[in-house]
Amino acid sequence: MTPWYLYLIRTADNALYTGITTDVARRYKQHQSGKGAKALRGKGELTLAFSAQVGERSLALRMEYRIKRLTKRQKERLVTEGEGFEALLASLQTPTLKSD
């Protein structure tokens, strides 16, 4: 099974874009060449701000969803300190049990 990664790219205007991939270097090059996400086209210089291995695709999708809903300040803490990443990953890996 190929591992999936979550990544954040910083645009020239300091915005953070969140995405998932199986190959961060390849995907980053696609974004830089304008062949990646439409949201990043014409945004100037792009820098890879953060990347981490997540695991399987379904978990990566859930992580991406949650991180896209964080505030800018929370995303900045994730990028600079890795704050909250492991806890978020663990919370999504833990199956929730429903009680009747």
Swiss-Prot record:
Pfam families listed in its UniProt record: GIY-YIG
UniProt cross-references to InterPro entries, sorted A to Z: GIY-YIG_endonuc, GIY-YIG_endonuc_sf, UPF0213_domain, UPF0213_GIY-YIG_endonuc
SUPFAM superfamilies per record: GIY-YIG endonuclease
Highest taxon of the lineage: Bacteria
Domain GIY-YIG: 2-77
Family from the record: Belongs to the UPF0213 family.
Protein name: UPF0213 protein CKO_04549
Taxonomic source organism: Citrobacter koseri (strain ATCC BAA-895 / CDC 4225-83 / SGSC4696)
Lineage of the organism: Bacteria, Pseudomonadati, Pseudomonadota, Gammaproteobacteria, Enterobacterales
